[in-house]
Amino acid sequence: MASRLLLLPRRRSRHGGASLLLARLLSSSSSEAGGGGAVEKVLVANRGEIACRVMRTARRLGIPTVAVYSDADRGALHVRAADEAVRLGPPPARESYLNASAIVDAALRTGAKAIHPGYGFLSESADFAQLCKAEGLTFIGPPPSAIRDMGDKSASKRIMGAAGVPLVPGYHGAEQDIELLKLEANKIGYPVLIKPTHGGGGKGMRIVQRPEDFVDSVLSAQREAAASFGINTLLVEKYITQPRHIEVQIFGDQHGNVIHLYERDCSLQRRHQKIIEEAPAPNVTAQFRSHIGEAAVSAAKAVGYYSAGTVEFIVDTLSGEFYFMEMNTRLQVEHPVTEMIVGQDLVEWQIRIANGECLPLSQEQVPLNGHAFEARIYAENVPRGFLPATGTLHHYRPVPSTATVRVETGVEEGDTVSMHYDPMIAKLVVWGESRNAALVKLKNSLSNFQIAGLPTNVGFLQELAGHSAFEKGLVDTHFIERYQNDLLSTSTQALSGSHEAEELGAILAAACICKKDHVSSEVSLHDKKLSMWYAHPPFRMHHFAKRLMEFELDRELGGSSDDLLKLSVTYRSDGTYFVETEDGSSPGLDVKVDSRGDHDFRVDVGGLQTDVTLAFYSKDNCNHIHIWHGKHHHHYRQTLRAEQSPDDSSQPSASSEARSHPKGSVLAPMAGLVVKVLLKDGARVEEGQPVMVMEAMKMEHVVKAPCAGYVEGLKATAGQQVFDSSVLFTVKENKPN
């Protein structure tokens, strides 16, 4: 049986006291109730932003915290945020954050009587929850039995079916023989979705359109599932071609009470991973909201659930029906959007329920106030298919947090995003009285979220938030695929429209750089402070001084231009700068610059004043210049001479061989681990034939031959780490001798 989605505008519920609730949620002052009971000291068995998030609430409740860390995270923000910290082991997760016995031992050594698992890692491990219980520790989460029942997606489907929760047609059995799975897929009918029975986050999911691709997809999904969750069993379901992903936040206590805190729409995804979530879901009726909430509560009650959980549904936009997909037995990454619309701290609820307290609200008392968005900011290379990226945060300036804007992060400027863990840098969460108001706030906050040093998806998120279909709430899980050309700004019209802003950005950057040099590089000459412009050629101590500058544009969303922007900057005696393009393609501009710090400037162009931020760093034999002006962010490069190249030493760069690779060379698409080498050096290959499999941040990537020929220089072996853009092998037309 399925429930139907009615696509009608939502009547916005308005409740008083929203500002007070949000202020309480974000406050760092101590709670009037305190944190007694079983949870008197908590170890957070996680890292990054979620560890910092849990510690913030614990601190507000007066509860001391213990962090755990790998060698890669020795100086991480979550370690510094805790009262105590314990080393777990080397960087690989299986030797650190997935080492259950080491984590329990850390809790016992430090006297922490409770463990909060966060999300990911061991958060959905029934064995870990059971181990905590056996050692007399409070696991801040659901009972092990519920984790086990719902963690096995095949078992959970059977339980949900018995409870009357609607299910997608599919195979959920224990038998994993590949021929049986193939037979079941044929019965279901293509396209089918292959999904691991354990874990989440899109890891190991494969959409298979044709029977001939099924076996390879199963093998790849099994490898990725094993690497991510330690279990490689799969289920096969009918693939809904035009789905929405809507999930319901539920909460239960140890006294049998279960409520829902409304739904979230998580349809905007790439690689089956969410990147923008919102609450409540747009364009649904109150009747649908009630029905899907009731189904989620029924699902939780069927397994005796307590603590925070999320019941995920797939909604068929063609038929209007929704189906149970899975239940996440933990706090979700996107829980802040729910916190914003109900005005409650869900981590505090988890702690109080672990203490044996009742739910603080009944279903009728849960408010629905306004609208909230969350945008996940990742280190990733968008033009390369959203592959994860690594590097140093040379400049990191999130938007300031307020009562209606939250930034959840686990990094600071100078930190390194490594290949070992998820590449998420931060979560930007905004709230408004309506969806439109919240969306305006999201767009503005994204345009002011400053990161430089490695590729990110901030520009892509801006394109998403500004797309007309998204503004109308017309979302499904194929949104990014459908509007790819719009979002990646690859059309001629889009590139033409951005050129003016890019040129203006270069002009402003040139003027600000000159101002910075003028102010900070003064020398003493005859007891007078004069700019280095006057002390060093080619500038003269005359009425005017001129400087030539070149900028090579690096577009975040691809379509990089090989053309150089050549600018001439003339310093005038009145302190202004006249900047013009060397080719005279556009009229010159008079720019007045006031310095407001190392990175911040106020510029005046023809009477129009605006704030500008610049970031500088050197990497890969280039000076990198980032500028933020208005809603725009641009990245320019300037090539350095060899003696001027203080490359970033914290992150190894590609070798000189990779920078000057011959025709047919295949470069590593990301920094990562070689999982499997499928061919031998010298082997004959066809265009598109898989040669090796790489893995980074738990995501698998198949490296294929770019053309037909013979493999040469294939030296990588399974287990070897390679750097981004390093040469993996070359495909040559003729067989090597």
From Swiss-Prot:
Ranges for domain Biotin carboxylation: 38-485
SUPFAM superfamilies per record: Glutathione synthetase ATP-binding domain-like, PreATP-grasp domain, Rudiment single hybrid motif, Single hybrid motif
Residues at the active site: 330
Record's function text: Biotin-attachment subunit of the 3-methylcrotonyl-CoA carboxylase, an enzyme that catalyzes the conversion of 3-methylcrotonyl-CoA to 3-methylglutaconyl-CoA, a critical step for leucine and isovaleric acid catabolism.
Assembly with partners or alone: Probably a heterodimer composed of biotin-containing alpha subunits and beta subunits.
Cofactor note text: Binds 2 manganese ions per subunit.
Protein name: Methylcrotonoyl-CoA carboxylase subunit alpha, mitochondrial
Binding site for ATP: 153, 185-246, 272
One cellular component (GO) term of this entry: mitochondrion
Signal peptide stretch: none
Gene name per UniProt: MCCA
